[in-house]
């Protein structure tokens, strides 16, 4: 590793953010104590943590660094004529009321049901301008890596750790290794960040990033919008990574400017000057590297029961016989048995029962626009739910007439929430049904007991909706 002109060693962005937040250094016997800039909470993983605080008589260490919303268990259907929300059960209603009480008692800013800013936590946080470059961000949710799109070190934590951050604003953490994923070239027509991340996970495998933070680099990544970068970082965990991030640039700053929690005036100028120093230094080294060519990719879709089991929509369902490793062969056989798919058969043409467009992976305005491109002037042939990721997304989409396009196509336009991604709120599929979903996980039963999930981009999902089967969105857009 060559030294910089000032004599210092080149550092990655992960090094820079980590070093700036170490309260106590890591030793062989103990993890580092890491300061946390932003703690996002929602109604499902936080109640137990607040209960522990009450039992121990503790207050929040930095309530202004904590921001709350509701998303997992809330209904995506509107209030009834009686003004009540149609919760799926009493437990869901109790989670919401408990969240309201916890935030009121501990002084946490909450944007709950009926609030104009409410949304899926990883859509809502960035929209508020709360997520900023160089921050450490945590949330009791697996897909917290979404916020890495801003050049933040963001990762999910467990319920006990939620309590630790509420009480101390710190966490015990071991320094992660680094993995550079460089994407050359540019994505072709009909492809998006979702296709890119599915291709990356298929290449790495679901454990390929274990113990690492992924930094996404290269011209194809730089060309992505902030929405695309959030999709990319969101699914880093599905490759086993602790987090994923993209260094901030003018695209980042333009997206953040003017948002409620973003710095203003002179403070904004000072912040941008700091943020410009965050990208990895020339000559910085990574523990591992992976390189892909974006121009060689095709629209992707999963066929199995983990996000790493992905192929091009033009491809064939893999044959386990081709697997030399016995364990990998058994895993593939089990996945195909659950999914009911035939080895060697084209995935295109596979009948689809339900389509879900939404989630913290693909519930942003850009995703709504992509889906509308395919739905406009066409009719869906299967049940289709389009669920905006936040009230802001919903409002913006409706201002553009996207809701009308969705409804005229025969699809359902819903209220914001996690919805069918995790199927906690009554939005689910039935046993044996196939769902093309823009969410992030295709585990057995993820969208309902016995349900079969195929992960894809909004374009590919919308193409499945209007054809009733897995289809190449490029052909649908071309009218073929």
Curated annotation (Swiss-Prot):
Q: Where does [4Fe-4S] cluster bind?
A: 360, 418, 421
Q: How is the cofactor bound?
A: Binds 1 [4Fe-4S] cluster per subunit.
The Gene Ontology biological process terms listed for this entry are: L-leucine biosynthetic process
Keywords of the record, alphabetical order, are: 4Fe-4S, Amino-acid biosynthesis, Branched-chain amino acid biosynthesis, Iron, Iron-sulfur, Leucine biosynthesis, Lyase, Metal-binding
Q: List the cofactors.
A: [4Fe-4S] cluster
Question: Which enzyme class?
Answer: lyase
Keyword Transferase belongs to the record: no
Q: Where does the signal sequence lie?
A: none
- Cited Pfam families: Aconitase
What EC number(s) are associated with this protein in UniProt? Answer: 4.2.1.33
Q: Does the record's keyword annotation contain Iron? A: yes
> What catalytic reaction does the record list?
(2R,3S)-3-isopropylmalate = (2S)-2-isopropylmalate
- UniProt-recorded Gene Ontology molecular function terms: 3-isopropylmalate dehydratase activity; 4 iron, 4 sulfur cluster binding; metal ion binding
The record's section on InterPro entries has: 3-IsopropMal_deHydase_lsu, Acnase/IPM_dHydase_lsu_aba_1/3, Acoase/IPM_deHydtase_lsu_aba, Aconitase_4Fe-4S_BS, Aconitase_4Fe-4S_dom, IPM_dehydratase_rel_enz, IPMI_cat
Pathway this chain belongs to: Amino-acid biosynthesis; L-leucine biosynthesis; L-leucine from 3-methyl-2-oxobutanoate: step 2/4
Explain the purpose of this protein.
Answer: Catalyzes the isomerization between 2-isopropylmalate and 3-isopropylmalate, via the formation of 2-isopropylmaleate.
The Swiss-Prot or TrEMBL record describes its family as follows: Belongs to the aconitase/IPM isomerase family. LeuC type 1 subfamily.
Q: How does it assemble?
A: Heterodimer of LeuC and LeuD.
Indicate what this protein is called per its UniProt record: 3-isopropylmalate dehydratase large subunit
């Amino acid at each position: 590793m060559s030294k910089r002109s000032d004599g210092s060693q080149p550092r990655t962005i992960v090094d820079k953010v980590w070093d700036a937040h170490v309260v106590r250094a890591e030793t062989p016997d103990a993890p580092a104590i890491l300061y946390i800039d932003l703690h996002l909470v929602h109604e499902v993983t936080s109640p137990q943590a607040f209960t522990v605080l009450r039992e121990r008589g503790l207050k929040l260490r930095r309530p202004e660094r904590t921001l709350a919303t509701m998303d997992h268990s809330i209904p995506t259907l509107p209030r009834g004529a009686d003004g009540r929300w149609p919760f799926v059960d009493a437990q869901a209603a109790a989670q919401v009321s408990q969240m309201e009480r916890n935030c009121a008692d501990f002084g946490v800013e909450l944007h709950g049901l009926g609030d104009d800013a409410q949304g899926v936590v990883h859509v809502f946080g960035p929209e508020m301008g709360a997520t900023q470059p160089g921050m450490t961000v945590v949330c009791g949710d697996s897909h917290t890596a979404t916020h890495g799109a801003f050049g933040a070190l963001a990762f999910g934590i467990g319920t006990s750790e939620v309590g630790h951050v509420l009480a101390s604003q710190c966490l015990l953490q071991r320094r992660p290794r680094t993995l550079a994923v460089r994407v050359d070239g540019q994505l072709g027509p009909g492809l998006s960040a979702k296709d890119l991340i599915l291709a990356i996970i298929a290449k790495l495998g679901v454990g390929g990033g274990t113990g690492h933070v992924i930094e996404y680099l290269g011209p194809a990544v730089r060309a992505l919008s902030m929405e695309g970068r959030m999709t990319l970082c969101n699914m880093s965990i599905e490759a086993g990574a602790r987090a994923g991030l993209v260094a901030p640039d003018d695209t980042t700053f333009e997206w953040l400017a003017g948002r409620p929690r973003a710095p203003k005036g002179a403070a904004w100028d000072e912040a941008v000057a700091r943020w410009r120093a965050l990208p990895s230094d020339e000559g910085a080294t990574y523990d591992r590297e992976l390189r892909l060519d974006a121009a060689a990719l095709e629209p992707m879709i999963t066929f199995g029961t983990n996000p790493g089991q992905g192929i091009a929509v033009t491809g064939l369902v893999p044959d386990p016989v081709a697997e030399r490793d016995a364990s990998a062969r058994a895993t593939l056989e089990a996945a195909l048995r659950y999914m009911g798919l035939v080895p060697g058969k084209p995935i295109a043409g596979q009948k689809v029962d339900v389509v879900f467009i939404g989630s913290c992976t693909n519930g942003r305005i850009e995703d709504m626009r992509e889906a509308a491109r395919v739905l406009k002037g066409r009719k869906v042939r299967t049940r289709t739910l389009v669920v905006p990721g936040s009230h802001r997304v919903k409002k913006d989409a409706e201002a553009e007439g996207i809701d009308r396009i969705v409804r005229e196509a025969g699809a359902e336009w819903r209220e914001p929430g996690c919805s069918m991604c995790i199927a906690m709120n009554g939005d689910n599929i039935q046993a044996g049904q196939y769902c093309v979903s823009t969410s992030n996980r295709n585990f057995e039963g993820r969208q309902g007991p016995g349900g079969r999930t195929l992960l894809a981009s909004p374009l590919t999902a919308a193409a499945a909706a209007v054809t009733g089967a897995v289809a190449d969105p490029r052909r649908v857009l071309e009218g073929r």
